[in-house]
């Protein structure tokens, strides 16, 4: 499995943000759902080595997040909800900067591939600050996949996009999920139903359910994902 998590825990003072969760993930798109404050973003930050865990273990592509953080980062692409970008940079300039960080062998070739893959061609010569939110999200995603990682962690990648932009980003995520392991955090149930192969619902720092969408519906009298989510988290 590309991701393996065992009893992962994060404690802030007296508050347990993530409480001993365990799961595995392989190629495909894993929907990571939960209400605000459930521990989703904290889990993602631990998996991407932005913050250390308090207890438990996790590995990405066989590398432990505690003992081999640089190897984890080489094998993972992360698009945080805030999508930090250098708005004074041109699109190609920003991608070139990221390519330099990753020391890519043929940066120009890879940048061209990613620009085409993410649909940034028409905007590649603009400054990032001139782009719409949809294209900024594409730049963030392009940066995340530039070094061709096996694992992608995407935190609310379609937040604030219009319907046309949503379709484009969802299709891109779906295409990437054919060969990569993607952890997708979102509050949009239709998005999960459109692109995810499996769903984890986390509530109060614990995993409430971990299953495929068909199995989840079958076990809940074919209720909608939204109805299932409300039942599991409204307590």
Name every feature range the model reports, one short phrase each.
Residues 210-211:
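ABC ATPase "signature
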């Amino acid at each position: 499995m590309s991701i393996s998590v065992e009893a992962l825990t994060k404690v802030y003072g007296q508050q347990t943000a993530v409480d001993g969760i365990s799961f595995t993930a392989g190629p495909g798109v894993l929907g990571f759902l939960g209400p605000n404050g459930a521990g989703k973003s904290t889990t993602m930050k631990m998996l991407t080595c932005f913050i250390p865990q308090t207890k438990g273990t996790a590995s990405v592509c066989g590398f432990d997040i505690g003992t081999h953080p640089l190897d984890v980062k080489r094998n993972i692409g992360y698009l945080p909800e805030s999508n930090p970008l250098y708005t004074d940079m041109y699109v190609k300039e920003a991608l070139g900067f990221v390519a330099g960080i990753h020391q890519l062998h043929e940066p120009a070739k890879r940048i061209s591939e990613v620009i085409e893959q993410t649909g940034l061609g028409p905007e590649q010569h603009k400054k990032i600050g001139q782009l719409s939110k949809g294209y900024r999200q594409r730049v963030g995603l392009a940066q995340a996949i530039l070094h061709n990682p096996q694992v992608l962690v995407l935190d609310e990648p379609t937040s604030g996009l219009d319907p046309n932009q949503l379709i484009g980003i969802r299709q891109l995520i779906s295409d990437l999920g054919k060969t990569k392991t993607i952890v997708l955090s979102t509050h949009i149930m239709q998005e999960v139903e459109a692109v995810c192969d499996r769903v984890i619902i986390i509530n109060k720092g614990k995993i409430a359910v971990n299953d495929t969408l068909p199995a989840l519906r079958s076990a809940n009298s074919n209720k909608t994902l939204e109805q299932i989510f409300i039942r599991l988290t409204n307590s």
